[in-house]
């Protein structure tokens, strides 16, 4: 995939995303349904002087799950401790993290689906009853230690909700699905980022970036950064529609946010398989990508935009894809 359209965070994103991160719900653009629900739950918990129920945030990468976790902590007025599933390799690692929590704190675990099962099992009692029992030592000298924990809120984030075990999923009192962003919301995000970057962006240019951002704020901010470079070197520093079109064309991002590989998938299906159906394994071989990459990185957006559909026989290209790429659509094929 064209790196600029990769929804996973790149090294350059980390510092930038932190500086752009909204602090409270009234600064957070988009995800209105999730925000509305969480605001009610947080206000109710504060009125009862209780900790917020554990929260699961799930959805595709780049949609602001980490940002939402920090907003939750800020709205609660508590500290947040951040870690990731792959970093918690053994129960002792989890115990060390839990032991640092203060009453009411938020513990944010990103990629929670990647925690080892032995760690996950220790987490069950911590989430449900705020205690853990852990074995110390080995053999005849081993002993069980009971550790009481302060009440806390676990916020877990995952791009693979289906990989969570049922016992873990059941312990989250609140589950919030983060969805792809509407173009108008992305336009507002581009404008907000431009203000922080102190770069002038014309309205139609902001919308053009939004339209090509694959419904993802991380990509919108990354595209704005690159277009800003073109505006600085090839223009007068302002980001207008002309410089935006030129920059994104050079960067191989078309009007629908498709990159070279997206187009290659669709063209291969049209030119070789007459639009399909074709099996995902066969398609992956044809475009020289592994099956998982096609399924995880390309297919979801192509389906969401209406260019591709799944059938029992395999994947099929839609009439919209034919028209977008300039092919004549024959319904009988």
From Swiss-Prot:
Region (Small ATPAse domain (RuvB-S)): 182-252
Family to which the UniProt record says this protein belongs: Belongs to the RuvB family.
Reactions listed under catalytic activity: ATP + H2O = ADP + phosphate + H(+)
Keywords recorded for this protein, A-Z: ATP-binding, Cytoplasm, DNA damage, DNA recombination, DNA repair, DNA-binding, Hydrolase, Nucleotide-binding
Organism domain of life: Bacteria
Swiss-Prot/TrEMBL GO biological process terms: DNA recombination; DNA repair
Sequence segments annotated as region (Large ATPase domain (RuvB-L)): 1-181
Name the record gives this protein: Holliday junction branch migration complex subunit RuvB
Entry's localization field: Cytoplasm
Main function: The RuvA-RuvB-RuvC complex processes Holliday junction (HJ) DNA during genetic recombination and DNA repair, while the RuvA-RuvB complex plays an important role in the rescue of blocked DNA replication forks via replication fork reversal (RFR). RuvA specifically binds to HJ cruciform DNA, conferring on it an open structure. The RuvB hexamer acts as an ATP-dependent pump, pulling dsDNA into and through the RuvAB complex. RuvB forms 2 homohexamers on either side of HJ DNA bound by 1 or 2 RuvA tetramers; 4 subunits per hexamer contact DNA at a time.
CDD domains, per the entry: AAA
List of residues binding ATP: 20-21, 62, 65-67, 128-130, 171, 181, 218
Subunit field text: Homohexamer. Forms an RuvA(8)-RuvB(12)-Holliday junction (HJ) complex. HJ DNA is sandwiched between 2 RuvA tetramers; dsDNA enters through RuvA and exits via RuvB. An RuvB hexamer assembles on each DNA strand where it exits the tetramer. Each RuvB hexamer is contacted by two RuvA subunits (via domain III) on 2 adjacent RuvB subunits; this complex drives branch migration. In the full resolvosome a probable DNA-RuvA(4)-RuvB(12)-RuvC(2) complex forms which resolves the HJ.
Broadest EC class assigned to this enzyme: hydrolase
NCBIfam families registered for this protein in UniProt: PRK00080.1, ruvB
Naturally occurring in which organism (per UniProt): Lactococcus lactis subsp. cremoris (strain MG1363)
């Amino acid at each position: 995939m064209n790196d600029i359209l990769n929804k996973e965070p790149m090294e350059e994103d980390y510092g930038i995303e932190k500086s752009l991160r909204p602090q409270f719900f009234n600064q957070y653009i988009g995800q209105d349904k999730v925000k509305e629900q969480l605001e009610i739950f947080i206000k109710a918990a504060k009125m009862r002087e209780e900790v917020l129920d554990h929260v699961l945030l799930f959805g595709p990468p780049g949609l602001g799950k980490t940002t939402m976790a920090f907003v939750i902590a800020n709205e609660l007025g508590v500290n947040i401790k951040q870690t990731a599933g792959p970093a918690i390799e053994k129960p002792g690692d989890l115990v060390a993290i839990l032991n640092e929590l203060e009453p009411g704190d938020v513990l944010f675990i990103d990629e929670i689906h990647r925690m080892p099962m032995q760690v996950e099992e220790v987490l069950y009692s911590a989430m449900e009853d705020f205690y853990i029992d852990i074995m110390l030592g080995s053999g005849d000298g081993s002993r069980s230690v009971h550790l009481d924990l302060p009440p806390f809120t676990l916020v877990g984030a995952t791009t693979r909700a289906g990989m969570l075990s049922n016992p873990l999923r059941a312990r989250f009192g609140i589950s919030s699905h983060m969805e792809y962003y509407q173009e108008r919301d992305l336009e507002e995000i581009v404008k907000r980022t431009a203000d922080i970057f102190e770069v002038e962006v014309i309205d139609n240019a902001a919308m053009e970036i939004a339209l090509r951002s694959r419904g993802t704020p991380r990509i919108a901010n990354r595209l704005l950064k690159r277009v800003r470079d073109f505006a600085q070197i090839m223009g007068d520093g302002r980001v207008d529609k002309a410089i935006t079109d030129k920059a994104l064309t050079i960067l191989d991002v078309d009007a629908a946010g498709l990159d070279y590989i997206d187009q290659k998938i669709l063209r291969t299906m049209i030119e070789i398989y007459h639009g399909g159906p074709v099996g995902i394994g066969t398609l992956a071989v044809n475009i020289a990508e592994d099956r998982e990459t096609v399924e995880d990185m390309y297919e979801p957006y192509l389906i969401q935009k209406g260019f591709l559909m799944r059938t029992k026989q395999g994947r099929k290209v839609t009439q919209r894809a034919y028209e977008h790429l300039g092919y004549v659509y024959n319904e009988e094929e």
